[in-house]
Structures are given as structure tokens and as C-alpha cells.
């Protein structure tokens, strides 16, 4: 029996080695207490996954929730990194910081490790699933993963509906008494529309340690409500902690489900033109189900094809005016838009600025110019000797396109079509002329003659109305791309 077991372990090790070109350990912290073991594939696809094993934030199950997965991923050309993160002992910033640094490190080493920095995912099990979902919902763009794989994840930090030990270890005994903290790190409450990465959740119906309904399913429900890309697989049995154990009856089915999901989420082409759409609720897709796909940026993506990657940075109710009641400048979406380093930026802001409590013509013009400056700062022109002169100019990228607001057919929420027509549009045209920018005149193009292009509030387009916007923007984009 012992000989058979040794033979099995030897064959398993040979399988991993056959698909793994390099295996090494990288320190995340100088003392090596946080580190990750890298498994680089023989034939890299460019995709990478950082793995967070579970263990209730008290220890790590690094085998069946870590190293045992290496051959599966390497066989698909996916670089795999098993993260040893430090335990929080009540300080949540410790494991969060380790994981965020691991993602940064993978992206920073992308060229050397043959990884596409826009195709770095995270995988987590149980408490590691909470950590993975926390980094997916609470991180800035540079260390937020591009997709999440969550196995029987702890999502809630309410000890009455999840694994109590994970809650106490992550937040601390005092933190558990803070309702604000409990809510903030119950990650179904932290899902960001358009910004939280696509996710797949895999759990068992009979999990008695981390109840699916108040955890994994709650995360799925939050993602679906926001119109984000999310898939949910609930297996009939398996309890908690099945991981990569081949003895689990649904092991092969689970691997097939995960493989199909990974294959259906292709990485963006490295040479794809990056497009950022910055706007208010009309860009966000207010009132449109599955707006990530059906709002005008999503429709634009479909029209453009895989030669482009279109990101939706719309936020409902937001203003261009910094002193408006809800300025876009304070939003994660704005920070993401800057960090994205787009090739093309489309700005569609002004509808909410027309409200009486917001409108200020002088400030609107100066804030529009400031936004352009932040997206594409002017730099000194160099002379023949390569030295800077007093003359300033903008770079060719990003190409900035301004959109006028669509008509406001009703004065809902105090929005004024008169202010839009007589004040906002002339300012947009003036700034565009001064800065040599293109304008998409949506106010003139938009057609609601049949009443099917606009929702009942008279402000927000329907899916059909958003189709008009997408096609109008497409026509301008085609001029140079």
C-alpha cells in the first residue's frame, strides 16, 4: 500500500512538472512571512491567477486549496501563484495589503513572466474567498483583479450568518461590534457597478460552515442587481472545503464548469484600443437591466469588436462641476478612468449640472478644461536639442471626444433642457474648438419621435435610445481608428 501511495505521489509531481516550466518563491514582505509560490506554465497564454487559500483567517490550507491546483491551471497556459498571506489578528489591512501587493507584483513582472497585466485574476477559498472578494471590491485599479474565482466564500462579516471565526479574526473583537465595519466588509454591500470584476462562485448546497444563501449567493445577487458579470454554481453535496479533492463526487464536473467559464472570459487583445466612457446615469445605464452590456458603452463595445476594450465609468447623478451636489471627481469611477490610461476618452457630462442648485457657467467651463488637463496634461515642446521650450502641447493620447447631453424631455429632478441648449452645449463647443477636440452632438442626433427611445422620466434613454448614442459615437471613432 505504501509503495502504491509513493507511486501516486511521484506521478502527481511529474504531472505538475510536465506542465510547469518554472517554479519559484517570491517574497511579498522583506522577511518572507508573506510570499507566493509561482508556477509558470510551459506554454503561457498570458493569463495569471493569484490564489488565496482558506483557513478562517487563522491558518492556510495550502494544498487542496493551493498547490494542488497548479497542474490544472498550467495545463491551460495559466500562470498560478499560491499566496501565503499573513493572518490579520484583528488588523484587516495585513492580509489585504499582502494580497494587493501580490497582484501588483504579478502585473509589474508581466513582461518577464509572460503575463498580460489586464488578465490577472484572483482565486479564494472560504476565508480566502472573503479576502479575494475584499480585494475585488475595496481596491484601487492597480491592484484590483480582472476576474474572481470564489469557492464556498465567506462574504458576510455578520457572525450570525457566516463563519464566526473568520469575522473575529479579520475585524477583531472590537471591530465586530462596529456595525459600520461589519457592513463595509460584508462584501455583497461593496459591489461596484461596472467596476467590480467578473466572478464565478462555486459552492455546495449542504455547506453548514459558510451558509451559501447569506454568503456566495448574496454576492451573486449583488453582482446581478448591479448588472455585473457573475456566474453561480451550487452543487448538491460537498459540504465545506472540497477544494481540489478528487474524492468529491462533483470534482470532474466542477473542473469542467470552471474551464468553460475561463474559456468564455477571454482576455483583451494586447493591441486593443482602450476606450474610457466617463459620464452620469445615462452612461451608467440607469433603468436598463444588465447595463454593463446594454447601456451605450456596452453596445459600443459590441459594435467595435475585440479590437477595442470599452470601459464604463458612468455614475448616476454625477456632475462635471466640482461644486455640484454629486461631483464625478470624488468617485472611484473617476480614479479608475485616470488609472486606465485609455487611448480614447469619451466625456458625456452636463445633464445634472443643469439643475438650479448646481449650474454655474464659469465653473462648468473651467472644470471641463481641468478634466481635459488631467486626462491629457500639456507638456513642453522640445527643441532640436531635446530641451523643453515655453511652448506647451498635449500628447496624441488619449484622444478626447466630448458629447453634448441628450435632450431632457421632462424637467425631472430639476434638469433643465433650456440650460443644456443655451449654456452647456455652447460651452462644450467652445472648449472643443479651443482644444481641437471632436464633439458628438447627441442633443441634435437623438430621436424620440416614436416614444421608444426614452424612459418615462424623459431623461434616461431606453436600450433602443442608447443604441442611437453608441452608433453616433462609433461614427466619430471611425474617423481615425
Regions found by a protein language model. Give the residues of each.
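Active-site segments of SGNH/GDSL-like serine hydrolases
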Residues: 348-352, 374-422
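Catalytic His-Asp segment of secreted/periplasmic serine-dependent ester chemistry enzymes
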Residues: 239-245, 288, 318, 406-481
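Conserved SGNH/GDSL esterase-like catalytic core that processes O-acyl groups on lipids
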Residues: 164, 271-277, 282-369
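C-terminal catalytic histidine-bearing segment of alpha/beta-hydrolase fold enzymes
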Residues: 34-37, 217-269, 459, 463, ...
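Catalytic nucleophile-loop/oxyanion-hole region of alpha/beta-hydrolase
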Residues: 61-68, 81-117, 246-253
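Short beta-strand/loop motif that positions the catalytic acidic residue
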Residues: 200-203, 207
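Conserved alpha/beta-hydrolase "acid-adjacent" motif
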Residues: 208-215
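Primarily recognizes the serine-hydrolase "nucleophile elbow" in alpha/beta-hydrolase
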Residues: 101-166, 182, 187
Amino acid at each position: 500500500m505504501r509503495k502504491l501511495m509513493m507511486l501516486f505521489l511521484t506521478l502527481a509531481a511529474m504531472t505538475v512538472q510536465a506542465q510547469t516550466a518554472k517554479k519559484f518563491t517570491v517574497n511579498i514582505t522583506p522577511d518572507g512571512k508573506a510570499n507566493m509560490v509561482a508556477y509558470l506554465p510551459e506554454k503561457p497564454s498570458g493569463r495569471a491567477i493569484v490564489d488565496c487559500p482558506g483557513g478562517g483567517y487563522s491558518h492556510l490550507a495550502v494544498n487542496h486549496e493551493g498547490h494542488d491546483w497548479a497542474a490544472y491551471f498550467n495545463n491551460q497556459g495559466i500562470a498560478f501563484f499560491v499566496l501565503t498571506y499573513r493572518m490579520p489578528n484583528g488588523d484587516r489591512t495585513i492580509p489585504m495589503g499582502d494580497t494587493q501587493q501580490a497582484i501588483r507584483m504579478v502585473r509589474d513582472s508581466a513582461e518577464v513572466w509572460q503575463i498580460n497585466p489586464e488578465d490577472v485574476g484572483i482565486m479564494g477559498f472560504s476565508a480566502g474567498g472573503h479576502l479575494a472578494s475584499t480585494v475585488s471590491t475595496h481596491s484601487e485599479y492597480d491592484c484590483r483583479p480582472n476576474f474572481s474565482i470564489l469557492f464556498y466564500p465567506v462574504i458576510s462579516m455578520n457572525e450570525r450568518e457566516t463563519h464566526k471565526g473568520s469575522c473575529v479574526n479579520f475585524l477583531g473583537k472590537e471591530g465586530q461590534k462596529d456595525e459600520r465595519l461589519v457592513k463595509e466588509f460584508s462584501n455583497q454591500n461593496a459591489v461596484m457597478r461596472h467596476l467590480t470584476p467578473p466572478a464565478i462562485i462555486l459552492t455546495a448546497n449542504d455547506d453548514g460552515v459558510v451558509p451559501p444563501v447569506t454568503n456566495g449567493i448574496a454576492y451573486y445577487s449583488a453582482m446581478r442587481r448591479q448588472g455585473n458579470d457573475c456566474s453561480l454554481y451550487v452543487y448538491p453535496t460537498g459540504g465545506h472545503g472540497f477544494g481540489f479533492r478528487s474524492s468529491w463526487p462533483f470534482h470532474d464536473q466542477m473542473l469542467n464548469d470552471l474551464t468553460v467559464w475561463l474559456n468564455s472570459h477571454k482576455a483583451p487583445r494586447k493591441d486593443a484600443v482602450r476606450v474610457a466612457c466617463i459620464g452620469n446615469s445615462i452612461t451608467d445605464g440607469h433603468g436598463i437591466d444588465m447595463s454593463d452590456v446594454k447601456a451605450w458603452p456596452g453596445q459600443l463595445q459590441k459594435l467595435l469588436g475585440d479590437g477595442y476594450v470599452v470601459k464604463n465609468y458612468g455614475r448616476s447623478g454625477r456632475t462635471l462641476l466640482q461644486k455640484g451636489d454629486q461631483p464625478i471627481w470624488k468617485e472611484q469611477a473617476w480614479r479608475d478612468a485616470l488609472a486606465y490610461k485609455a487611448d480614447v476618452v469619451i466625456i458625456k457630462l452636463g445633464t445634472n449640472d443643469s439643475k438650479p442648485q448646481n449650474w454655474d457657467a464659469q465653473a462648468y467651463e473651467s472644470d471641463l478644461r481641468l478634466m481635459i488637463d488631467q486626462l491629457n496634461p500639456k507638456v513642453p515642446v522640445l527643441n532640436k536639442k531635446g530641451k523643453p521650450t515655453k511652448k506647451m502641447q498635449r500628447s496624441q493620447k488619449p484622444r478626447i471626444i466630448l458629447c453634448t447631453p441628450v435632450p431632457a424631455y421632462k424637467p425631472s429632478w430639476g434638469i433643465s433642457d433650456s440650460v443644456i441648449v443655451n449654456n452647456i452645449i455652447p460651452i462644450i463647443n467652445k472648449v472643443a474648438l479651443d482644444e481641437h477636440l471632436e464633439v458628438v452632438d447627441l442633443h441634435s442626433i437623438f430621436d424620440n419621435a416614436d416614444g421608444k427611445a426614452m424612459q418615462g422620466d424623459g431623461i434616461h434613454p431606453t436600450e433602443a435610445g442608447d443604441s442611437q448614442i453608441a452608433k453616433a459615437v462609433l461614427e466619430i471613432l471611425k474617423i481615425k481608428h
